[in-house]
């Protein structure tokens, strides 16, 4: 595939995919789900979330989600995935190779609990399955 596919990419799909990842992260790391254990394992003071720096974190997360959605759409186009299932599979392969594989041993080297890996990797697994499926059918 050559670079000409850039003109045919659905930029709205990339934006919606990034928004889904960002909203999923807001829910995943909220007090309703995993905020307490995640913060405790990282030694984060819950009061930190009330500071101005939280805004910069949210903005940088969304920008990263935009980049990830753009790259994921490239993988989907290159693989010619065109159904929800094949797109989710591309998302799974991306998660396995680029999220789980490097982060699991890194957590071991850093002496971090497996539960922390499971929370973080679980977020990316769900996010990449959903956005992979979405981008494949709405590319």
Regions found by a protein language model. Give the residues of each.
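Juxtamembrane/disordered regions of integral membrane proteins
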Residues: 1-139
């Amino acid at each position: 595939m050559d670079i000409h596919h850039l003109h045919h990419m659905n930029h709205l799909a990339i934006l919606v995919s990034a928004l889904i990842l960002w909203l999923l992260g807001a829910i995943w790391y909220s007090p309703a789900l995993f905020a307490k254990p995640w913060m405790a394992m990282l030694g984060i003071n819950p009061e930190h979330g009330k500071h101005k720096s939280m805004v910069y974190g949210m903005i940088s997360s969304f920008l990263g989600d935009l980049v990830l959605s753009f790259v994921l759409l490239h993988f989907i186009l290159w693989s010619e995935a065109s159904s929800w299932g094949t797109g989710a599979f591309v998302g799974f392969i991306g998660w396995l190779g680029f999220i789980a594989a490097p982060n699991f041993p890194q957590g071991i080297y850093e002496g971090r609990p497996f539960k922390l890996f499971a929370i973080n990797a679980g977020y990316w697994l769900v996010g990449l399955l959903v956005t992979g499926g979405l981008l494949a059918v709405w590319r």
